[in-house]
Amino acid sequence: FHVDKPETPGYKIELPEDGAKQIVEKKSDTVEEVDIASLLAMGDLAHGEKVFKKCSACHVVDKGGENKIGPALYGVLGRKVAAIESYKYSSAMAAYDKEWTFEEMNGYLKKPQSHIKGTKMAFAGLRKEKDRASVILYLNQNSDSPLPLP
């Protein structure tokens, strides 16, 4: 049995000349802003604790918990981004001069690398809105002073 090696590896996909443009336009048409109150209403604390197990390889959420690969997240909502002095953040994260609001956390959890370009967090993100909403509620609960929900 013998198979000749192709000149160029891969598959050729034929598109109409304006096909790529149509695909890009269609994708951008579906982008919509999420109302954070509606998003958080989808959340569930028990589900958030379960989903957070993906995060627990690198983060702790216990009061007084030590930094791991990532910073400790107890009381993260409402505090300044990159605020834990004992953790060495990426320069991108350290320069990101914002506070962890519900909206900021939602954007970051959705796609960390896109939300803060240059972050060293390698996690791809949480695609499902319910997962993000639940983790945000779980993080907010793990605080001495949880933020009031919108």
Predicted features along the sequence, with ranges:
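The canonical Cys-X-X-Cys-His
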Residues: G48, F52-V61, V135-L139
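Electrostatic cytochrome c docking/interface patches
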Residues: A20-F52
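Gly/Gly-Pro-rich "capping" loops immediately C-terminal to redox-active cysteine motifs
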Residues: E49, K63-F102, A122-L126
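C-terminal capping alpha-helices of c-type cytochrome domains
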Residues: F1-H2, E99-P150
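N-terminal post-signal-peptidase region of extra-cytosolic proteins
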Residues: I36-A41, S56-V60, K88-Y89
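N-terminal targeting signals for export/organelle localization
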Residues: F1-Q22
